[in-house]
């Protein structure tokens, strides 16, 4: 068997990189590194990163994902995580689930080992006062989203984008989407809370029409 070809095909299908094994190329060094990893986990040491080996190293990376966060000069760059890899994002306020003040999804989602390729976003209006409140509501209901956007614009990522969040009802929608909850309590009666806790009231939407029906005034976005 051509082990180079096998590992390249496996990486393309499953979504892993030689760097997961401490290597930079698909070569003999990678095969040897895979063998050593397999030995350490009690797996068949054949140097091939098949589904079994991939699941083990994927899980290991998920458990220690904080160790792989890229180093930056001023430590101000922001990242999101997809398939155990970091991607930079042009936004100053991003919190990942493993950081001290982040929100970690503990139930209500499905771990996916093969690389998932979501092709659309589902954005929800959470009808909660804050992302923390929304996260707690979702956890209590056994539901989840990948991202929450708070009142101050902070983006909270609660899980790897590659995992399936339970947020859109149908399995078809969930399997192919990224779920986002945008903080907004909706009802004008909460304006006092925003004034006290955020510093200003939200704008009011007073002329919205949906399916030919005029809606009562509701809070918009900052």
Residue ranges of model-derived segments:
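Active-site-adjacent loop/helix surface patches within enzyme catalytic domains
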Residues: 88-222
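Cell-envelope/ECM-targeting effectors and their regulatory/trafficking segments
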Residues: 1-100
């Amino acid at each position: 068997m051509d082990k180079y070809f096998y590992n390249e095909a496996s990486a393309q299908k499953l979504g892993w990189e030689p760097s997961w094994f401490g290597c930079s190329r698909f070569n003999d060094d990678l095969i040897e590194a895979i063998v050593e990893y397999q030995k350490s986990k009690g797996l068949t040491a054949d140097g091939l990163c098949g589904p079994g080996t991939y699941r083990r190293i994927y899980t290991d990376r998920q458990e220690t994902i904080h160790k792989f966060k890229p180093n930056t000069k001023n430590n101000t760059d922001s990242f999101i995580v997809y398939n155990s890899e970091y991607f930079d994002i042009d936004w100053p306020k991003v919190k990942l689930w493993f950081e001290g003040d982040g929100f970690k999804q503990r139930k209500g989602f499905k771990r996916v080992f093969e690389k998932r390729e979501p092709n659309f976003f589902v954005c929800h209006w959470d009808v909660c006062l804050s992302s923390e409140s929304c996260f707690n509501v979702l956890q209590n209901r056994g539901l989840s989203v990948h991202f929450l956007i708070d009142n101050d614009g902070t983006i909270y990522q609660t899980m790897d984008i590659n995992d399936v969040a339970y947020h859109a009802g149908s399995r078809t929608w969930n399997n192919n989407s990224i779920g986002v909850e945008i903080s907004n309590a909706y009802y004008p009666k909460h304006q006092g809370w925003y004034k006290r806790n955020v510093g200003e009231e939200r704008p009011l939407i007073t002329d919205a029409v949906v399916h030919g029906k005029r809606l009562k005034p509701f809070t918009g976005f900052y």
